[in-house]
Amino acid sequence: MAKYTEEQLFAIKEETSYVPQPQILSAFNELIEQVKEHAHQQQLQYQQQQQQQQGFSGIGSGVSGPGAQKWRNGDTYIDEHGHERSYHHMNRRRPSRSNNGEKKPFFNKKKTEVVVDEDGWETFTPVQHAHRGSIGEDGSEEKSKFRDSVSGSSGSGAGAGAGAGAASGSAGGVRARPNNKNLGSSKQVDPRQIASTKQTRTFNAFEALEGNDDEDDDE
């Protein structure tokens, strides 16, 4: 970066000082006056057009006075009675269906609970939803009840099977069958949706036919 002394800066200032020229300044002032006059003429012409348009609409529709000023576009038509009317009522904008941008309050939303301990510390606890019973204390209680019921049913089925035989004992157990709608998804199965079905021995037609053949041979 170039460095200058004070004497050099004063010399440069004298050399590059601006000297206004009177002919250029007068031409510039005349141009400004012409622009102002042109803008004033345009404003007067616009006001005259607006007044003529309002008067034409007021006469054609039979409306005069302040009520005729609301029709400013000048687009009119002849109705079935021969009167000239404006299209103003056809250009009205429909009201918005989004409640004018205002969001409706969500009354069903539950607030978070605040727990204050002895030291004064506040802890926010999330609200547990009713349909999510597998989370929280209610879900743990339901799980424990379901396990107890399954274990009790399986124990009784095993005891009955020991007295009747190995085949009947295996058939007397309890098998947990999950809900079919959740098999193809990664969502965890809710214990309340699991149906416990007790196995029963099905009827075999081939075994029945073989038993009849043996009885016929004995006869």
Swiss-Prot record:
Region (Disordered) location: 37-219
Comp. bias (Low complexity): 41-54
Keywords linked to the UniProt accession: Cytoplasm, Initiation factor, Phosphoprotein, Protein biosynthesis, Protein synthesis inhibitor, Translation regulation
Transmembrane regions listed in the UniProt entry: none
Single GO term (MF): eukaryotic initiation factor 4E binding
Family statement: Belongs to the CAF20 family.
Listed name of the protein: Cap-associated protein CAF20
Gene: CAF20
